[in-house]
């Protein structure tokens, strides 16, 4: 059970079952936080080793 914190203009992360992902999306043009996503990898809704964005959608790199 680990955790990952990613901050940037288009943050993405992946993890293993039980991991917690904290994604912080910055506004374009500055570093103010626009959106925050907190996701727990459960192996079902959020599968292991799949890239996930701040909204919780699975994404391809």
Predicted feature descriptions by range:
Residues 1-61:
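Short, glycine-biased loop/turn motifs at secondary-structure junctions and
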């Amino acid at each position: 059970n680990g955790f990952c914190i990613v901050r940037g203009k288009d943050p993405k992360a992946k993890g293993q079952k039980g991991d917690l992902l904290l994604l912080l999306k910055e506004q374009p043009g500055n570093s103010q936080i626009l959106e925050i996503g907190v996701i727990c990898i459960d192996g079902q809704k959020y599968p292991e080793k799949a890239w996930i964005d701040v909204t919780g959608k699975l994404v391809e790199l």
